[in-house]
Every structure is written in structure tokens, then in C-alpha cells.
Amino acid sequence: MEPRPGASTRRPEGRPQREPAPDVWVFPCDRDLPDSSDSEAETEVGGRGDADHHDDDSASEADSTDTELFETGLLGPQGVDGGAVSGGSPPREEDPGSCGGAPPREDGGSDEGDVCAVCTDEIAPHLRCDTFPCMHRFCIPCMKTWMQLRNTCPLCNAKLVYLIVGVTPSGSFSTIPIVNDPQTRMEAEEAVRAGTAVDFIWTGNQRFAPRYLTLGGHTVRALSPTHPEPTTDEDDDDLDDADYVPPAPRRTPRAPPRRGAAAPPVTGGASHAAPQPAAARTAPPSAPIGPHGSSNTNTTTNSSGGGGSRQSRAAAPRGASGPSGGVGVGVGVVEAEAGRPRGRTGPLVNRPAPLANNRDPIVISDSPPASPHRPPAAPMPGSAPRPGPPASAAASGPARPRAAVAPCVRAPPPGPGPRAPAPGAEPAARPADARRVPQSHSSLAQAANQEQSLCRARATVARGSGGPGVEGGHGPSRGAAPSGAAPLPSAASVEQEAAVRPRKRRGSGQENPSPQSTRPPLAPAGAKRAATHPPSDSGPGGRGQGGPGTPLTSSAASASSSSASSSSAPTPAGAASSAAGAASSSASASSGGAVGALGGRQEETSLGPRAASGPRGPRKCARKTRHAETSGAVPAGGLTRYLPISGVSSVVALSPYVNKTITGDCLPILDMETGNIGAYVVLVDQTGNMATRLRAAVPGWSRRTLLPETAGNHVMPPEYPTAPASEWNSLWMTPVGNMLFDQGTLVGALDFRSLRSRHPWSGEQGASTRDEGKQ
């Protein structure tokens, strides 16, 4: 007996089987059955339209973007005849299929009449998916909702790896992997790397669900991304009441608000002002401000699922941008908070207005660094708290930063008193001051510190020329400090600051005032290495250059002060630089003489410290380089590797660091591209090839060095692991002299044809091999 059209017959396992009559269009609708799923009664298709079915099913399918598109495109513009379908009469051809809008199928069609076991609706072809590996058929919206709660098949309770969708007659298909399950993560990642994934399902907490993921070079974006907002009215009220933050004052990227002044109007018509935080704080809890700056007003729609919340979020910014926005936030504020991380709520917004009452300076990346040699008695004028700007300055808007704060720390106009000793120094220092326009509290303090250093240099010039302001005096030159600075510290601190200034000028490309400024080609690398040496390894200067050095002692400072005081008056073109250079040179010479008298320090050269005059002896290496001293040294852990110097584009400088190690001298290895020292070669005796080349280049080295004629020990590398000599005779072998290398590994020596030794340093023929290898 064939069933009537419009009626369905239920099997005990819950799957209906429909066998319609030939040439009859059948539209079964299981939604018209009674509430009990076990009922066997046959009912007629009632007068319910697809609109009622859409309302009933919206709670389970509202979170899926593809379902919303399907319902909007197919069910929205078309209507359904409300009359009952009479038994045996085919429906009209233009009526869409019921239960999800499945198109009508002819009798004998394939598996288009499958019913989803979750929603008990007929599965539309474009919403059909098969679970893997159990291959049960469901609709995509139901499985995406189900899989977020439990990664198992609704029928057989098997762990699922991915969903198979979009199967074509040719056999191609796409997948929707489940990427957050630890048990099936590997198989799901393989599906993503294969390039078949068109969407992904994130199980567990949806607040941490990403919008896209990338595996194996393939990026998969979520077709229906989740949002951090909860989907129920109770959760909305509780969460938003706890994190509620008044909308004002807020900072926009273009016009940061000021304390005590109204923020400039934002493009889009937002009318929330800074002086209204109290009015905004009294907003009712029923319309709180969401984490994204929109007011959730459509609470009825939110209760049905994620779809309603998206509609309210889309409509809220448009409604809140009018002149009477109330608690709503304007478009400008929404744009300002669009770049915030997802999931971050109110506490990020509840910040004071920037630069209104904040005492911390703003550090700018391009500002010059603070001087590490700042005297402790010199205060920073820019660090004092400043009162808030007046209302007139605040109303100027974005034109606030530069012109408003520049006069706060700039020096007063030059008067006749302070500039009298050095009339030519002011035009030379004016362009430097004009370039350093302070941008924040930190840069203002640094600029003031530099101006104080220049004033100290001018005071040094005044003392050297016999003018007012000599040791301990308070002449006009001390009044040149900007912004009413405190009296300058003692003469030793002034000379120490003046000795540091030439190093900064030399780093910025200015001229070195020292008379002996000639430097070898490798001077920058040597100066950089010498600047990083501790005080125990390198002297404060060398060869009369005003290079970097350690802080001066009291005796050296007094000597440099007396030298600077007895110097002649400089020319007007370079007053400050000449005085600072003379003080640095005299300080270096005096401190070098004092250290040379002790006999334990060394002078500085372009390539590092050189031996000082006096008795010498073995001393520690500055870089803690040590050598094996015992005869029974432990062999190396693997095969010996040899890297040619030409392979790393480096050169060995034949300028030894005498007595830098316990047993020998060091030769620096310089990078040819940068000129920096990248490594050191340690000599252990005077008979090696490198020692021979060094002796030829520097004849006096053999008289100064303390190296022995022949090293008394050597490290024993391990023997080559393969015994047969035939394996060594391959195309990869490269003979170099009487040594044999295999891709950089030394494997043999003495004779390329006979290979009497596995390794030139092996214990069997070690002595003869070494002797022949050096010849």
C-alpha cells in the first residue's frame, strides 16, 4: 500500500521511508507531526507556511551563516499556499519544497530524501554533509551546532575527524575539519594541509575560537565566526553590568581629549562630550554598553541565538550615531575601538585621558639616549611636574604638541652677560639647538641635559681664558644654564663631562679636535671593541686620541683640570669643541701616565690593548680563552671540521694581542664586510705556519712574545670510524697537500695513494704526522 501524498510513515529507528506514487510530487513535512517522535499517526499537511517553520527552527540554525543565506534567498521572497493539500492531488509546481526548501524530486531519485537525525528535517542538497569515519548523513547547520558541544556522531557516538561536504559526481569533495579535539587533531590537520578544507569547527569554549587558521601553507577562514558576547539575556545583563564603563571621556586617534575641555566633534555625528561621565553612568542596565561600543537594545532577538545578536550589533552603531545618541556611542568611537583585541572588555576603556594628569614621560623611539655620565648634583628641569594647560590651549585641538610645550624648557633669550666670554660659540651651537625640538617630557629632559653640557664646556673655556667663573666661583658663565638650573657641580665632574663629549661628536660624524686624529683603516672596529672592554683590560685612551675611557680618578681629574686651566684661549669658531678636546687629551695623557707608572695597565691601539713598557708576564685572556695544558687531554667528541677563512669572508689581522692568553698570543679575525672582530686565532708556539707569517710581517714579534718554540701538548681527535680504506677513495675526497679532507672532515694524511694513517693526529703515528704536516 502506497502512502498518501503529504503523509509520512515512521520506522521504529526514527528514519521515515517514503515511496511516492509515480508522476506525483510529494512534499513531506515532519514538522506537522505531533510533538511525540514515536507517534505513528498519519496527518494531513496543514495550513502552516514556511514562515512558521522558519520561526520554529531558527533557534537551532541561527548560528550558521550558510543557513541564514539559504533561508533569506529561498524562503524570503516566495510565499506558500496556506490551503491544505488534498490527498492524491499534486501541488503547484511553483511551490517550494517544505522543510528547509528542498527542491522537488522525481520518484526514483537518489538520496535527496534523507532526513537529518538531529532536526528531523529533509536535508537540502547544498546542506548535506557526511561524517567521517562513520559516514552518517546530517545537515551542516545541525552538525556545526552539535560539534561545538560534543565531538561525536549523534547516531553512533563515534569520534569525528571532519565532515565531508560538496561531493560531486566526479568524486571530488571538500571537508570541514574539527581542529580543537586532541584525539583527532592530527587527522584534521592533514585535511587542512591537503587543501580540501573550506571551513572548520572549533569545539569547546567559543570565546577562544579563531577566525582563521593556517596549516601547511593553507589558510582556512571560518564561514560563521563566533563572537565573544553571550547569547542569553541573563548573561548579557550580568556581564555588561559588571564591566559597564561610561563612554566619556574617550580618546580617538585624531583628536585626543583634554582634561577639563570638551573633545572635538567626531565625524559621524557622535554627541558625547567629556564633561558628561555622570550622566552616562546612570544608564539603565537594560541597555548596557557592549564590549565593542554598541548598545544592545534588541534583547528579544538576542534570546533566540547568535543571529539576533548580529542584527542588533549591526543596527546599534547606526542608531547611536545621531545627535540624540543617549548612552549609545558614535561612529568615531566605534572606529577608535575597532583595533582592540577581541575579548577585552571594559577595563581597557576605563583609562584616564592621556597627558592630562600623567606624570610618566612618553618615550619616543627617535629621541637621543640619556647620558650615562650625568653628574648626580645636576637636576633635570623637565622632570618637575607641570600644571595642566589652560582651557584656551586645550581648545586648540590637534595643534597642541610642539608649540605649547617648547617654551617650558628652552633657554631664555641670550643676554649680554653669559655670551660675553665666547662670542663665536653661540652661532655654532644654535643650529644644534634648533634641530633638537623636544617632543615629550623625556626628550625635553635630554635636550636640557645637552644644553647644560654645552654650558659646562663654555664654563671650561671661561676658566681657561682667565675670565670669571673659575674654580668655585659663580660668574656669568654659570648663569647660562637653561630654565634656572641649580649651580653646577665640582670641577672634577665638569671635566669628566667635558671628556665624554668628544666621543659623542665623533660618533655623529663631527670633526675630532685632537691633533693626532689619524687612525688606521680598522679604527671603527677597534674603537667599538675598546669601548666595550672593562676598565681592567683597556686604558682610558691611547696615542693621544680623545677616545672612550673609564671615569677619571681624583688625581687624574685634578691633573686634567690644571691642564685645561693652563691652556690658551681657543678660537671663536670652535670654542666648546676645542676646549672639550683639549680637556679629553690632557685627561687621557695624565691618566695614561699615572696608569703606566703602576705597570699593570696597557695602552689602547686601533686593534686593542698593546703591551706597556715594563716587566711582563703571562696573564689571563680578556675573553677567558684557555688551552689544554695536560698531556692526556680528552679527545674531541666528533670528527674534526675545518672551515676555510675564505668561506666565511674573513681575514686574519697580523697584529697580535701579546700575552692575552695563558700560553700564547691572539690574532683577530675580521669580517671583510663590516670590519668587526668576529673571532680570534690563538698561537701556541713559534713553529706553525701562521706564526711564520706573523714573524715575516712583524719582525719584532719573536723578540716580544713569550710563546715556546714548540708546543708541548696537543688535543687528540678521535680516529675515523670506518675501517676499510676503499670507502675513502671517492669523488668527495679532496687532497690538500699531504692531508685528505672529506667534505670538510680531515680523514687521512701522509700519502694520498697509500693512506697509512687514518688521522694525522692519531696516537699511532702522531709525532711523525705532526712533523711532516708542518714541513
UniProtKB/Swiss-Prot annotation:
Region (Disordered): 1-112, 221-636
Biased composition (Basic residues): 617-626
PROSITE patterns, per database record: ZF_RING_1, ZF_RING_2
Entry keywords, A to Z: Activator, DNA-binding, Early protein, Host cytoplasm, Host nucleus, Host-virus interaction, Inhibition of host innate immune response by virus, Inhibition of host IRF3 by virus, Inhibition of host mitotic exit by virus, Inhibition of host RLR pathway by virus, Metal-binding, Modulation of host cell cycle by virus, Modulation of host ubiquitin pathway by viral E3 ligase, Modulation of host ubiquitin pathway by virus, Phosphoprotein, Transcription, Transcription regulation, Transferase, Ubl conjugation, Ubl conjugation pathway, Viral immunoevasion, Viral latency, Viral reactivation from latency, Zinc, Zinc-finger
Modification note: Phosphorylated at Thr-67, leading to promote interaction with host RNF8. Phosphorylated by host CHEK2; leading to increased SUMO-targeted ubiquitin ligase activity of ICP0. Auto-ubiquitinated. Deubiquitinated by host USP7; leading to stabilize it.
Catalytic activities: S-ubiquitinyl-[E2 ubiquitin-conjugating enzyme]-L-cysteine + [acceptor protein]-L-lysine = [E2 ubiquitin-conjugating enzyme]-L-cysteine + N(6)-ubiquitinyl-[acceptor protein]-L-lysine
Composition skew (Low complexity), residue ranges: 258-284, 310-321, 391-409, 422-431, 477-493, 550-592
Entries under Gene3D superfamilies matching the protein: Zinc/RING finger domain, C3HC4 (zinc finger) (3.30.40.10)
Compositional bias of kind Pro residues: 369-390, 410-421
Entry function: SUMO-targeted ubiquitin ligase that plays an essential role in nuclear antiviral defense evasion triggered by dsDNA viruses. Acts during the initial stages of lytic infection and the reactivation of latent viral genome. Prevents the antiviral effect of nuclear bodies by degrading host PML, SP100 and MORC3. Prevents antiviral response to viral DNA induced by IFI16 by degrading it. Additionally, inhibits host IRF3 nuclear signaling to prevent interferon production by the infected cells.
Family the entry assigns: Belongs to the simplexviruses ICp0 family.
Complex and partners: Interacts directly with human RCOR1/CoREST protein, leading to the disruption of the human BHC corepressor complex. Interacts with human CENPA, leading to its degradation. Interacts with human USP7; this interaction modulates ICP0 stability. Interacts with human CDC34. Interacts (when phosphorylated) with human RNF8 (via FHA domain). Interacts with human TRIM27. Interacts with human ZBP1. Interacts with host MORC3; this interaction promotes the degradation of host MORC3.
Name listed for the protein in its UniProt record: E3 ubiquitin-protein ligase ICP0
Taxonomic lineage from the root: Viruses, Duplodnaviria, Heunggongvirae, Peploviricota, Herviviricetes
Gene name in the database record: ICP0
